[in-house]
UniProtKB/Swiss-Prot annotation:
Belongs to the universal ribosomal protein uL22 family. Pfam families: Ribosomal_L22 (PF00237). InterPro entries: Ribosomal_uL22, Ribosomal_uL22_bac/chlpt-type, Ribosomal_uL22_bac/org-type, Ribosomal_uL22_CS, Ribosomal_uL22_sf. Part of the 50S ribosomal subunit. This is Large ribosomal subunit protein uL22. One of its GO terms (cellular component) is cytosolic large ribosomal subunit. GO terms for biological process: translation. This protein binds specifically to 23S rRNA; its binding is stimulated by other ribosomal proteins, e.g. L4, L17, and L20. It is important during the early stages of 50S assembly. It makes multiple contacts with different domains of the 23S rRNA in the assembled 50S subunit and ribosome. The globular domain of the protein is located near the polypeptide exit tunnel on the outside of the subunit, while an extended beta-hairpin is found that lines the wall of the exit tunnel in the center of the 70S ribosome. Keywords: Ribonucleoprotein, Ribosomal protein, RNA-binding, rRNA-binding. GO terms for molecular function: rRNA binding; structural constituent of ribosome. The gene is rplV. NCBIfam families: rplV_bact. It comes from the Bacteria.
Length: 110
């Protein structure tokens, strides 16, 4: 059975989070947690928290055995962007986009 966990509006761009998500797609959850623990990226912290949440959901809601779980699906969608202004020389201004992302992890025992 499949169990889902999400982190919406994570303060990192979808492009950066997808680099980390690609590392654990299809792996067993124990191996995926080890990979994320030693991945030196800010996005790895976000993905690890969502994966741990999905594992807890599977254990609590579905009574799944942790040893049988694997990362069935993981995908990252773009969230809303916060628009900010950066003052520049000679009275000009640039628009800065502070991007967010929605991280979804699905674990399965099949």
């Amino acid at each position: 059975m499949e169990t889902l966990a999400q982190h919406r509006h994570a303060r990192s761009s979808a492009q950066k989070v997808r680099l980390v998500a690609d590392l654990i797609r299809g792996k067993k959850v124990s191996q995926a947690l080890d990979i994320l623990t030693y991945t030196n990226k800010k996005a790895a912290v976000f993905v690890k928290k969502v994966l741990e949440s999905a594992i807890a959901n599977a254990e609590h809601n579905d009574g799944a055995d942790i040893d049988d779980l694997k990362v069935a699906k993981i995908f990252v969608d773009e969230g809303p962007s916060m628009k900010r202004i950066m003052p520049r020389a000679k009275g000009r201004a640039d628009r800065i986009l502070k991007r967010t992302s929605h991280i979804t992890v699905v674990v399965s025992d099949r």
